[in-house]
Design a protein with these regions (language model features):
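C-terminal motif of bacterial Sec signal peptides marking the signal peptidase cleavage site
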Residues: 16-19
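Flexible loop/hinge segments that line or gate small-molecule binding clefts
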Residues: 93-132, 140-143, 150, 156, ...
Length: 261
């Protein structure tokens, strides 16, 4: 997915540069990240690499650290500065739609990345099919449970499009299995500590379940850590989403038998 973003940005800017050979200028890309984590940091590094590959490009990075008010301010600042292209990963579905619309109406191309906003005033969306991800995980767990079992869900940020879509896909996948129940669902806000606290809340209510479906690997790891603190980590199967091929990432955790998937 990162490669597609990288490609569309530089094709677009390449065409602009070709059209402006007579008057070279700096093309400014404003990048508004909703949060900070391993894969977003990797994406930022790849985008910044563009400055070394083409000295006509300036990449400005901003992260709101899950703060809707701050992200609105950052996007509007990019608009006021007159950037040539905006790449935005909205924190929540409706939180920055007005700022996105303002940029688009000012004639600034807007690429929504990873997450959507509830407006149609944007140039392109690049992201994965989060509904399909949730449905695939639901199908996987249903098959592992052979149609009967109890699941707890640890969700991403309430109101964020990946959390909404992954939940919907998961629930649709297990709908044909009346013997499978989601007995608890807690928000973890995409953070490891959020996963810890969500799992602790669940374990206070009940310890009678089979699987943990977490909307991200960080949430799943937090849930695992919370269970481990109570000596319960071997009682449950943990699943997450991301599969980063880094130290401590999802692929390594599956390989080591900590995550089921």
């Amino acid at each position: 997915m990162k490669r597609y973003l990288y490609l569309i940005i530089y094709i677009g800017l390449g065409l602009s540069l070709a059209a402006c050979k007579q008057q070279p200028k700096k093309f400014v890309i404003g990048v508004s990240q909703c949060s900070e984590d391993i894969w977003r940091d990797k994406l930022n590094d790849e985008l910044k690499m563009g400055e070394y590959l083409n000295d006509s490009i300036i990449v400005k990075l901003a992260s709101s650290n899950d703060d809707n008010v701050l992200q609105n301010k950052q996007v509007n600042q990019f608009v006021d500065e007159g950037v040539d292209l905006l790449v935005i990963s909205p924190n929540q579905l409706s939180a920055i739609s007005k700022a996105v619309e303002r940029a688009y109406e000012k004639g600034i191309p807007v690429i929504l990345y990873d997450r959507i906003s509830n407006t149609d005033k944007y140039t392109a969306f690049i992201g994965c099919d989060n509904y399909h991800i949730g449905k695939s995980m639901g199908t996987f767990i249903a098959q592992k449970l052979q149609g009967k079992g109890r699941i707890v869900e640890i969700c991403g940020l309430d109101g964020s499009s990946p959390a909404m879509e992954r939940h919907l896909g998961f629930m649709d996948a297990i709908k044909p299995y009346p013997g499978i129940q989601v007995i608890a669902s807690e928000e973890g806000n995409w953070k490891e500590e959020g996963g810890v606290q969500a799992m602790k809340r669940i374990l206070k209510k009940t310890q009678d379940f089979d699987y943990v479906f977490a909307h991200s690997d960080r949430l799943a790891w937090g849930a695992y850590e919370a269970a481990k603190q109570m000596g319960l980590q071997h009682r449950y199967k943990f699943t997450g989403v991301d599969g980063m091929a880094t130290q401590g990432g999802g692929l390594e955790l599956v390989r080591d038998g900590i995550f089921e998937a």
